[in-house]
From Swiss-Prot:
Homology family: Belongs to the peptidase S14 family.
Biological role: Cleaves peptides in various proteins in a process that requires ATP hydrolysis. Has a chymotrypsin-like activity. Plays a major role in the degradation of misfolded proteins.
Catalytically driven reaction(s): Hydrolysis of proteins to small peptides in the presence of ATP and magnesium. alpha-casein is the usual test substrate. In the absence of ATP, only oligopeptides shorter than five residues are hydrolyzed (such as succinyl-Leu-Tyr-|-NHMec, and Leu-Tyr-Leu-|-Tyr-Trp, in which cleavage of the -Tyr-|-Leu- and -Tyr-|-Trp bonds also occurs)
Location of the active site: S98 (nucleophile), H123
Gene Ontology annotations of biological process type: protein quality control for misfolded or incompletely synthesized proteins
Originating organism: Histophilus somni (strain 2336) (Haemophilus somnus)
Subunit note: Fourteen ClpP subunits assemble into 2 heptameric rings which stack back to back to give a disk-like structure with a central cavity, resembling the structure of eukaryotic proteasomes.
E.C. numbers: 3.4.21.92
Record localization: Cytoplasm
Coiled-coil region(s): none
CDD domains listed in its UniProt record: S14_ClpP_2
Keyword Nuclease carried by entry: no
The protein's name: ATP-dependent Clp protease proteolytic subunit
Residue intervals passing through the bilayer: none
Length: 193
């Protein structure tokens, strides 16, 4: 069981308490933490759409600390980030691995950053399927299509060639914040505000 801190605000109408994440959402900050999965993706997408409706001209900030997870859940978040009008700033706090790194790179160009001791990891998508040989073949073809799509989007966001992305994602590829900047996954390493 996790405890979520509460924040108390004084207003002209008295005190009002919020959980910390709701309070930060008022400041256009979204936390993408933990495994990327369908329920979390739906919450992130809803927050992105809500903030766009509130003010389509104002940046949205996504703080990422994720080991990665589901490709389809991650693509729901990614597609929404690309679809909405506001610029989406991404910031890696802790780690952005696998789909977390993909979402980090998918922020608005020039507005993607990592904290100095953050770790970023890219690799090819993982798959596992059991069943009849024909079904295994279908799933293998699907994961190869997904791999191609992810590589194309990473190449677009980083400026690396598809061939370089394919080589660098063949195995787990861990990077420091500075290495992620040199690679093009982020634009800046933030030391202080």
């Amino acid at each position: 069981m996790s405890v979520i801190p509460m924040v108390v605000e004084q207003t002209s109408r008295g005190e009002r308490s919020y959980d910390i994440y709701s309070r930060l959402l008022k400041e256009r900050v979204i936390f993408l933490t933990g495994e990327v999965e369908d329920r979390m993706a739906n919450l992130i997408v809803a927050q992105l759409l809500f903030l766009e409706a509130e003010d389509p001209a104002k940046d949205i900030n996504i703080y990422i600390n994720s080991p990665g997870g589901s490709v389809t859940a991650g693509m729901a978040i990614y597609d929404t980030m690309q679809f909405i009008k506001p610029n989406v700033r991404t910031l890696c706090i802790g780690q952005a691995c696998s789909m977390g790194a993909f979402l980090l790179a998918g922020g608005t160009a020039g507005k993607r950053a990592a904290l100095p001791h953050a770790r970023v990891m890219i690799h090819q998508p993982l798959g596992g399927f059991r069943g009849q040989a024909s079904d295994i073949q279908i799933h293998a073809q699907e994961i190869l299509k997904i791999k191609q799509t992810l590589n194309e989007r990473l190449a677009f966001h980083t400026g690396q060639s598809i061939e370089q992305i394919e080589q660098d994602t063949d195995r787990d590829n861990f990077m420091s914040a500075e290495q992620a900047k040199l690679y093009g996954l982020v634009d800046d390493v933030l030391i202080k505000r």
